[in-house]
UniProtKB/Swiss-Prot annotation:
PANTHER family: PHOSPHOLIPASE B-LIKE 2-RELATED, PHOSPHOLIPASE B-RELATED. Residues 1-29 form the signal peptide. GO terms for biological process: dorsal appendage formation; imaginal disc development; phospholipid catabolic process. One of its GO terms (cellular component) is extracellular region. This is Putative phospholipase B-like lamina ancestor. It is an enzyme of class 3 (hydrolase). Its main location: secreted. Putative phospholipase. Involved in the regulation of cellular plasticity in imaginal disks. Keywords: Glycoprotein, Hydrolase, Lipid degradation, Lipid metabolism, Secreted, Signal. The keyword Glycoprotein applies.
Amino acid sequence: MLKVVGASWQKTRIGTYILIGAGLLVIGAFFIGYMERPEYDGTYCATALWTKQVGFQIENWKQQNDLVNIPTGVGRICYKDSVYENGWAQIEVETQRTYPDWVQAYAAGMLEGSLTWRNIYNQWSNTISSSCERDESTQKFCGWLRDLLTTNYHRLKRQTEKAENDHYWHQLHLFITQLEGLETGYKRGASRARSDLEEEIPFSDFLLMNAAADIQDLKIYYENYELQNSTEHTEEPGTDQPKNFFLPSATMLTKIVQEEESPQVLQLLFGHSTAGSYSSMLRIQKRYKFHYHFSSKLRSNTVPGVDITFTGYPGILGSTDDFYTIKGRHLHAIVGGVGIKNENLQLWKTVDPKKMVPLVARVMAANRISQNRQTWASAMSRHPFTGAKQWITVDLNKMKVQDNLYNVLEGDDKHDDAPVVLNEKDRTAIQQRHDQLRDMVWIAEQLPGMMTKKDVTQGFLVPGNTSWLANGVPYFKNVLELSGVNYSEDQQLTVADEEELTSLASVDKYLRTHGFRGDLLGSQESIAYGNIDLKLFSYNARLGISDFHAFAGPVFLRFQHTQPRTLEDEGQDGGVPPAASMGDERLSVSIEDADSLAEMELITERRSVRNDMRAIAMRKIGSGPFKWSEMSPVEEGGGHEGHPDEWNFDKVSPKWAW
């Protein structure tokens, strides 16, 4: 009897414990439910690991807030896609100097490909895939282009491996290695996400995406030389005129401001607006912090340009806009470029495209190995075949406050006082200041097969002439004459423009006012092409502070409390607005083809955009932001997968973690 009672008590005690435990679990769950959970902003991070025995591995950390403490490994990456929020994605990649350069490069490519694979696919589908399948002629051109770039890739790979002790060629080798890693990472990312993509991206199309800046030049060569010599060429006699392709180009504005009271204090104002197909508007702000060396030997010095930030596109390892800021030990500089106009197609006879080096690879190599702006221009002058542009590069470290003696001399000259008597020490100090300013600003201009470069610092310090508007018209006289382009004062800044350009806000207004929107040309002429972004940069030498922000999407003006005007009202003005007068009269666009340019700008014929239509388009920039839903399928041309419908975004200033 006692045994039965004891057993029953034991069961009761166990049951009580179970009930208490269950109650505690309920209470704990209640409190956990009300605890503050970590909120993430959509930033995904990963680390690349490498050993000789195992090879490469990627550790994905999913969403993270504590970016600083992401494990370094060979390299690490953080990526946030905010295209629907502000028009930009953002990516930051860092590698470690203790690993061989080729390991750093391949790991960086793998990391980027694995996290951005979806945007890479969308960009390829919107641009290359849709453009190359448009008709028979573009299919043939794309086939020729893929064969050329693949052959060129194998040639470059062999040559860079042989010339590993050449600083420039070593960087080209690393670019190729990073691109190979990008393809591997793309495949791994898509496989890891178990994505069922409609098409595979061949490696030749990764090459093609990274040759985006060269394609317009290659198209000119193809139409005028490759196609003309082809046995399949059946064009009627008398119609084989040279084919050139002009589009509303990117615009770049550079101004160095000197304070009236302290002319020795310099400030840089810089604006850049890219021209391109609306289909290519999947944008990424990138930062590459790669600790490469001058050669493949780990004991060689680290390159000056370790830290490079730029605005770019998915799947492309450089800007192609082009705008870069470069930092490193004793280095802080910017680089900007726009396409250059060329009427002299005879220059292409001296160029062999099989020996080309893609522009984006050349620029990234120059950015990394150049300690100053002269060496940057010299590096860019190697292999100037395709990707013809005009460039400006500014050394921000040279924009420092002048010494006190120089200030006194400037003040005496200003007030017509008696000059200060100089001794040898004073003269030396002044000469050192002039030497300091030397090589602060360089301009380089490339036509097929040649490049002209020069230190133009003094030209930017002359009162009343401190700005340069780069819109494709050559800066140097010899380049202008060789290009056959007609110079026009209407394409340059006026005195009134110079006086108004005193801040980033005024640079912003100028570039928007003189922007081009092909979707506003009218119902019969609309094309999905124009100025698709705006980047603004300033540097205050006194404070040593820079400011950068970017806008995504076709440019438009934000008017407040303004009654919209009708076209009838505009017609009563009896004149062309100032904005239209700044239009380049030589620009021409093939409407039938330009609507499908995508990233590749595959144009096959010419037809001018009438001046009156351009004037209307430029006026209507104030009508509001671009919307895909307001364009017909014919006008759209390429695709727009992954794009927001309305491109109405405010400025974005990236914040970097490392």
